[in-house]
Amino acid sequence: MWAVLRLALRPCARASPAGPRAYHGDSVASLGTQPDLGSALYQENYKQMKALVNQLHERVEHIKLGGGEKARALHISRGKLLPRERIDNLIDPGSPFLELSQFAGYQLYDNEEVPGGGIITGIGRVSGVECMIIANDATVKGGAYYPVTVKKQLRAQEIAMQNRLPCIYLVDSGGAYLPRQADVFPDRDHFGRTFYNQAIMSSKNIAQIAVVMGSCTAGGAYVPAMADENIIVRKQGTIFLAGPPLVKAATGEEVSAEDLGGADLHCRKSGVSDHWALDDHHALHLTRKVVRNLNYQKKLDVTIEPSEEPLFPADELYGIVGANLKRSFDVREVIARIVDGSRFTEFKAFYGDTLVTGFARIFGYPVGIVGNNGVLFSESAKKGTHFVQLCCQRNIPLLFLQNITGFMVGREYEAEGIAKDGAKMVAAVACAQVPKITLIIGGSYGAGNYGMCGRAYSPRFLYIWPNARISVMGGEQAANVLATITKDQRAREGKQFSSADEAALKEPIIKKFEEEGNPYYSSARVWDDGIIDPADTRLVLGLSFSAALNAPIEKTDFGIFRM
């Protein structure tokens, strides 16, 4: 009956009551409209977005090959499973693996290709427990740590700490990449921080499990040594602070890697390792048993309802949004294709309407959604602040859908207090302790990025679509600002500034902003947690909210709001 009622209410029905009990019941009006699939605009949008999605999938498949066929063949010849095979054998059969930061290191080091940053990170279910998995890819530079490798691992550990996810380290690395050691070793957020994080998480009862499946040298030896429990593969895994060449150089002693730091030594004599494994398969089997013995049970601070598919196909997002950021679209149409039953209870629908706020569910989890439908005015910012406060009071996780050029500017709006109203929203988002997830579906510019929970505001996860752009402002806007400043300066100096001069000034600025605002530029530097196919959005968000709810929701305290 309810399914029939929901269909009858499509889209956003505002029918007159049929009787005194017309508004009773649990039904919520469905959101969204059926697009004209045959229209020229829809077809053009679909084609452009589909091309970006195809490019995304091609690049992901290339990254999955790691260091290439030769390196993979050498790895296999040593009796090892490939890193992705290790993960497949570790997680529960048929369960998804939410891979993070796939494009870390993409085109970052000029001619040095470091697919995935030489490490695979992501969330998978192991013996029924959602875990953060961090796996070195020894096919990429022997698993050596580049600066971006460290940054990617630190981000994975940050996610694990925020969401209380047990960490499983599949170790197979030669340690720091020495030619870039200055950017790997000495600073606060360099390699040493990974061990600091291990210690802190262990102290907070967030399990740290290491599986030594290859080399574990120098500082890397602390990964298993600092783990709560570890496993080592015989005649394959090694743990030592100094390898055979360094031992010989320092002491003159000649010793094999196995005798210096192999499974027999560490399981029978040193006590550094806890479990001895025959091979990779056996090690992963033992790891699943270790997780089973964590005695962990997920406790939720939210209500759960049965999951329902949206009423509209996910790939319609291609035709609705497209790749041209200058074309507007209603964010409600995006919401309709990611939430359960396409049902959305909008909050303050007629006030501050350039910001859409409301309640929905994704895979049964309650979510408060904040989505952009244009530039932010004072009314929009105050509405957003009010809604964030509501969600914090009710322990409802927040989802931010960013497509924002920023806050409104101009004398009229400054006089009305846009600065203090925008500050309210920024402060509310910063202080919110409920799980926050951000998805950039279009532009992410200027202070709008802050108000909509950009990276600096610690969302538990931040994803980006392949059409999106992130920058302090658009390239043309930046070029116009700098051209105006230059023109005024030349005028004060009594010099000419011709249209040709202006064009010559603007061209490299626009090009630079376009390059640096590209999602691949962002993802290469781990400014986000991954570029995702819009059609996969619902699944990615569902897995992310599920992971985030492993941690208890803390009480939110707000500071002073300037009234």
Curated annotation (Swiss-Prot):
The modification N6-succinyllysine is found at residues 70, 141, 495. Changing residue 352 to R: In MCC2D; produces severely decreased wild-type residual activity. Changing residue 456 to V: In MCC2D; shows virtually no enzyme activity. It holds the Pfam family Carboxyl_trans. Keywords: Acetylation, ATP-binding, Disease variant, Ligase, Mitochondrion, Nucleotide-binding, Transit peptide. GO terms for cellular component: cytosol; methylcrotonoyl-CoA carboxylase complex; mitochondrial matrix; mitochondrion. Changing residue 310 to R: In MCC2D; mild form. Residues 309-555 form the CoA carboxyltransferase C-terminal domain. Residues 49-555 are annotated as: Carboxyltransferase. One of its GO terms (molecular function) is ATP binding. InterPro entries: AcCoA_carboxyl_beta, ClpP/crotonase-like_dom_sf, COA_CT_C, COA_CT_N, MCCB/AccD1-like. One of its GO terms (biological process) is branched-chain amino acid catabolic process. Its EC number is 6.4.1.4. Changing residue 441 to T: In MCC2D; uncertain significance. Belongs to the AccD/PCCB family. This is Methylcrotonoyl-CoA carboxylase beta chain, mitochondrial.
